[in-house]
Amino acid sequence: MARCIPSACSKALLGASLLLGPAQANPWQQARFPVPQFSGYTSHYGLRTGASGGSSLHRGLDIAAPLGSPVLSWWAGRVERLINDGSCGIGVAIRSGPYEHLYCHLQGTIEQDTLRSGGASLRQGSWLRTGEPLGAIGVSGRSSGPHLHWGVKLNERWLDPVLLLRAMADARRVETPISQARP
């Protein structure tokens, strides 16, 4: 598993600043949690045991939310590919510099090279801003209930999305003025 401590990931992000937008003192402030209406995490990154008893590497974080809830782009980037298969179901992969972020189990359809989900319409090569809706929570593919499977690669290596969420939370804590901090 690739480690993504804030300093290491920040360097990778700053190195891709032309694609990702203007550099900031803390680039993690630009990132956005992909499921604003989430209700919990149902499966974490790492080894897990399946119903058949075998173990496999789960390359992402499963985020439960009500069916049809919006899914947002974690970071600005280009749609690299649209996915429609038995595992991911309806999904999209977005390229943001050294990062590829994957969104699976979306509601909707892919027809004529266009993903239509939750009011969003995406084609390969489309540009998305950080926080822009890219689809809606669904149950497509291998899914036992409504959720988003969110996978992230850094320089083509899978990493634990929880590390990104921690870096985002740390960035926001650093920037919260003391007068706004809760006791």
Predicted regions and their residues:
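Conserved beta-strand positions that form and line the central face of beta-propeller blades
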Residues: 62, 93, 102-105, 136, ...
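Histidine-centered catalytic micro-motifs
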Residues: 145-152
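Short peripheral tails and domain-boundary helices/loops at the edges of structured domains
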Residues: 153-174
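Bacterial N-terminal signal peptides that target proteins for export
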Residues: 2-13
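Surface-exposed, glycine-biased beta-strand/turn segments
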Residues: 23-91, 96-97, 129-130, 139, ...
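Short histidine-centered loop motifs in beta-beta connectors
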Residues: 72, 82, 98-131
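Bacterial N-terminal signal peptides
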Residues: 11-21
